[in-house]
Regions:
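Conserved N-terminal phosphate-binding loop of PLP-dependent enzymes in the Aspartate aminotransferase
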Residues: 1-366
C-alpha cells in the first residue's frame, strides 16, 4: 500500500501508448528477467485476466498467421467473449451468451481417475485428424494448475509432450498463470515445476496484489510480430497497478514467499489428508495441488471417487456463516479450493482449517 500511495501522489494516469512511464518499464524489465523460458522476453500489460488470455491468442495468431486455438476441458481463461470460448465449462460461463468465437477446440484434461495423459494426447491427435490440421493451429493454451477446473495439476509428462508437439508443428504454447503465478505454487510460475518452457505467459491476480493489472510475457520475436498500436488499452498497465506489482516482487523476495508457499502447502495437505482417513466426517478426496494452491473434493462415499455434485456451494455457505471465506470449483461444483494468503500466519491458517473440519463433522451427522 505504501508503494501505491507514493505513486498516487505522483500521477495516476497517462495511457502508456501516449506517454511511457517508469513503473511500467521497470516492472516489465523485472518480469522479462524472470520469464520462465530462455532467450529474450518482452512484457505488455493490460487490466484483467481475460484481457491477458485474449491478447496472448492475438499475439500467437499474429506470429503464426493461423487461427485455431486448442484449450482443455475444465479450463478457465476469463469472461470476455474469446476467453469464454476458451473456457471449458458451460455453466455459468457460456450458456447464456449465444454464439462464441469459432476455431476454438477442447480436449480432455487428465484427472487421475478416468482420463490419463495418454487419453488427452490421443484426443489431441484425433482432433488434428478430424477437426483441424495442426498446420492451422496458432496456439495451445493450458493452466499449469487448473483453477476453476478443480486445482488439477497438469502432469509434467503432458506438458513435455505438448511442448514437443508445438515444436513439431510450429504451434505456440501459452501458459495461463493468472491464478497459479507469483509464488502461489512455490515457484514464481507454476509451469516452472515441470521444466517446460512456454512461448507466452498470461499473468494477473497476484501480479499486483489485487490491483487491476494483467499482462503477457512472451518471447521477443512473438511480441514483435504485432504492429504498433495493435495491443493495449486506455487503462492497460495503469501506474498504480505497476507500482503495486513492483512491491509484490520485492515482498516475494524479502519475505521468502516461495518457501512460505511450499511450507504452507505441506501444512494444508497434511491436515486435509488426516480428514480423508476419518469416517466420522463427510467423505473427501486426498488433497492435491502445488505449493499453497490446494484443493479437495467432497465425495459421495468413503473410499470412492464420485464427487457429491454441487455440494461445494453449501459447504462454502456454511463456512461464511462461521466467518471463513471459501470458494468452490470444479466442473461438478464439489471441489473446495484453499488459497490462503501467503502472508497469513500458521495460527490463522489453522483457525480456518478448524472451521472446515467442524463443518465436515456437522454435515456428516446431518
Amino acid at each position: 500500500m505504501d508503494a501505491v500511495k507514493k505513486q498516487l501522489d505522483r500521477f495516476t494516469h497517462t495511457a502508456f501508448q501516449v506517454s511511457a512511464y517508469e513503473p511500467y518499464i521497470e516492472l516489465a524489465e523485472k518480469l522479462n528477467a524472470r520469464a520462465p523460458f530462455s532467450g529474450d522476453a518482452k512484457t505488455i500489460f493490460f487490466t484483467t485476466g481475460g484481457e491477458a488470455t485474449e491478447n496472448a491468442v492475438k499475439i500467437a495468431r499474429a506470429a503464426t498467421g493461423r487461427n485455431g486455438v486448442i484449450a482443455f476441458c475444465g479450463g478457465f481463461h476469463g469472461r470476455t467473449l474469446l476467453a469464454s470460448a476458451l473456457t471449458g465449462k458451460v455453466l455459468p460461463y457460456k450458456a447464456p451468451f449465444g454464439t462464441l468465437p469459432g476455431e476454438v477446440y477442447h480436449i480432455p484434461f487428465p484427472d487421475n481417475h478416468d482420463i490419463t495423459v495418454e487419453d488427452s494426447l490421443k484426443m489431441l491427435h484425433f482432433l488434428f485428424a478430424a477437426d483441424i490440421s495442426p498446420n492451422n493451429v496458432a496456439a495451445i493454451i493450458i493452466e499449469p494448475v487448473q483453477g476453476e477446473g478443480g486445482f488439477r495439476v497438469a502432469p509434467t509428462a503432458l506438458l513435455k509432450q505438448l511442448r514437443a508437439i508445438c515444436d513439431q508443428h510450429g504451434i505456440k504454447l501459452i501458459a495461463d498463470e493468472v491464478q497459479s503465478g507469483f509464488a502461489r505454487t512455490g515457484k514464481l510460475f507454476g509451469i516452472e515445476h515441470s521444466g517446460v518452457e512456454p512461448d507466452l505467459v498470461c499473468i494477473a491476480k497476484s501480479l499486483a496484489g489485487g490491483f487491476p493489472l494483467s499482462g503477457v510475457i512472451g518471447r521477443a520475436e512473438l511480441m514483435d510480430s504485432v504492429p504498433p498500436g495493435g495491443l493495449g488499452g486506455t487503462y492497460a498497465g495503469a501506474p498504480l497497478g505497476c507500482a503495486a506489482g513492483l512491491a509484490v516482487l520485492d515482498i516475494i523476495e524479502e519475505e521468502k514467499l516461495l518457501d512460505r508457499a511450499n511450507n504452507m502447502g505441506e501444512r494444508l495437505k497434511a491436515r486435509i489428508a488426516s480428514w480423508h482417513k476419518r469416517t466420522d466426517m463427510l467423505p473427501i478426496s486426498m488433497p492435491r495441488g502445488l505449493g499453497a494452491m490446494v484443493a479437495f473434493d467432497i465425495l459421495e462415499r468413503h473410499a470412492g471417487v464420485e464427487q457429491r455434485k454441487g455440494f461445494g456451494s453449501k459447504l462454502c455457505a456454511r463456512a461464511c456463516e462461521k466467518g471463513l471465506i471459501l470458494l468452490a470449483c470444479g466442473v461438478q461444483g464439489a471441489t473446495i479450493r484453499i488459497l490462503t494468503p501467503l502472508t497469513a500466519s500458521d495460527e490463522l491458517v489453522d483457525e480456518g482449517l478448524d472451521i472446515i473440519e467442524q463443518i465436515l463433522l456437522e454435515e456428516a451427522k446431518a
